[in-house]
């Protein structure tokens, strides 16, 4: 969409150099045209089921409201292309992207604040989902349209063959991982199975992303809030150190994690589970359709993560609708955000076995069992509600995730490194990151 006017030169500067602090919502007085078509970007593979789901949602929105929407799916270099459009003073009107991107986009001045008074369905949104769209200063810059949390996938046939119970503690978890590694659960007479599938690559911070399910359950943390939106590093607390050491022992001592994990992102890790090389996998619900087809629904089960030293907290994630600065159709932006979190929008996003944009509903009036009767989805929904935790909405979560991923990866790759020394180095790096973002505790 072409802009007749663009307010806020700081938006352009921040998009180019990525160093600006947050500013007020830009583009608020751009000349408005409520009939202008909306340009929507969604971070998903072009031509894939995610794009089809977004198109389906946009079509339902058009039918319900009369606003026109053009959907563009981009996966590779999404953030770079968004910055290029900012430099051209021509951002899309709406972006559907990961909830963790809020801080970065807000700090670059790319977003406008959302007035919840104009989003009537916001009152029906799940509280923690709504909170995930708030910036450090408590203002709303994103609205959730989909949620998810991690559950434990187990090769049910392996577990039953070895006469093991579903793990209820970390000790049970470790014992099952060892049994799957050493007791030939597939019965082929070869030592070719491993207990746990784990994507521990440094790329996009995968190692940190995966490990958070264990760190938080142990009572540890990457960074902790100290009040007034400030944070301090937390990887050298006793809880964090114990969590790292316990997880590290899975790879270095009992050797129950698949070989090559430290170089693997999610695609090759997914393959180890569906190919019968690993027996447990901590992951969200988005892989159920794939594993049902490739592995077989009867071969694996979905259960909550066992309780760690503190509790069973797992990573909560999801997608958010972001209203971009400089739009000439702010009424249309608001209408789309409202529709996306409405009961109708949520059910539309959940429809079908593939190509859905909504994993777990964020509208409290939507009963997942009525839309998806498969009980595994209810398990995921209960985990999200009871144990899900989002990463904090700091100005930029990416460097925290990336830096911690590099340390976790190094500790898993080199079993000779000293755990406490590496975590002490990590805390110093995290302190610098927090200081750079202006949120370090004094």
List where the protein language model places each region.
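C-terminal lobe and pocket-closing loops
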Residues: 285-297, 308-406, 441-442
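Glycine-centered hinge/linker elements that transmit conformational signals in sensory
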Residues: 177, 228-261
């Amino acid at each position: 969409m072409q802009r007749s006017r663009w307010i806020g030169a700081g938006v352009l500067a921040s998009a180019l150099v990525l160093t600006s602090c947050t500013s007020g919502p830009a583009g608020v007085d751009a000349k408005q045209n409520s009939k202008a078509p909306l340009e929507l970007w969604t971070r998903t593979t072009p031509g894939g089921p995610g794009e089809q789901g977004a198109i389906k949602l946009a079509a339902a929105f058009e039918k319900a409201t009369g606003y026109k929407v053009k959907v563009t799916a981009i996966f590779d270099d999404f953030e770079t292309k968004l910055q290029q459009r900012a430099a051209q003073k021509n951002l899309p009107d709406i972006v559907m992207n990961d909830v963790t991107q809020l801080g970065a986009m807000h700090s670059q001045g790319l977003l406008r604040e959302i007035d919840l008074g104009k989003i009537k369905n916001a009152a029906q949104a799940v509280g923690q989902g709504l909170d995930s769209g708030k910036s450090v200063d408590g203002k709303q810059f994103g609205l959730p349209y989909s949620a998810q949390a991690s559950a434990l996938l187990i090769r049910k046939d392996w577990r039953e063959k070895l006469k093991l119970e579903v793990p209820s503690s970390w000790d049970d978890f470790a014992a099952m991982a060892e049994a799957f590694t050493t007791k030939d659960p597939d019965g082929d007479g070869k030592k070719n199975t491993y207990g746990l599938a784990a994507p521990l690559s440094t790329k996009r911070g995968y190692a940190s992303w995966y490990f958070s399910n264990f760190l938080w359950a142990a009572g540890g943390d990457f960074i902790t809030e100290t009040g007034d939106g400030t944070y301090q590093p937390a990887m050298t607390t006793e809880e964090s150190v114990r969590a790292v050491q316990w997880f590290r022992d899975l790879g270095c001592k009992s050797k129950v994690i698949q070989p090559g994990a430290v170089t693997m992102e999610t695609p090759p890790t997914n393959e180890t589970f569906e190919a019968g090389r690993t027996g447990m996998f901590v992951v969200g619900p988005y892989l159920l359709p794939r594993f049902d087809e490739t592995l077989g629904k009867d071969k694996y089960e979905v259960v909550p993560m066992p309780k760690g030293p503190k509790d069973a907290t797992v990573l909560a994630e999801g997608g958010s609708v972001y209203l971009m600065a400089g739009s000439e159709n702010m009424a249309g932006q608001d209408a789309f955000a409202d529709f996306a979190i409405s009961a109708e929008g949520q059910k539309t996003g959940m429809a079908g076995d593939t190509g859905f944009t909504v994993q777990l509903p964020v509208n409290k009036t939507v009963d997942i069992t009525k839309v998806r009767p498969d009980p595994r989805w209810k398990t995921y929904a209960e985990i999200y509600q009871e144990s899900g935790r989002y990463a904090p909405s700091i100005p930029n979560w990416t460097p925290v995730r990336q830096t911690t991923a590099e340390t976790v990866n190094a500790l898993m790759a080199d079993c000779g490194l000293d755990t406490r020394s590496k975590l002490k180095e990590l805390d110093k790096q995290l302190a610098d990151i927090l200081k750079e973002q202006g949120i370090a505790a004094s």
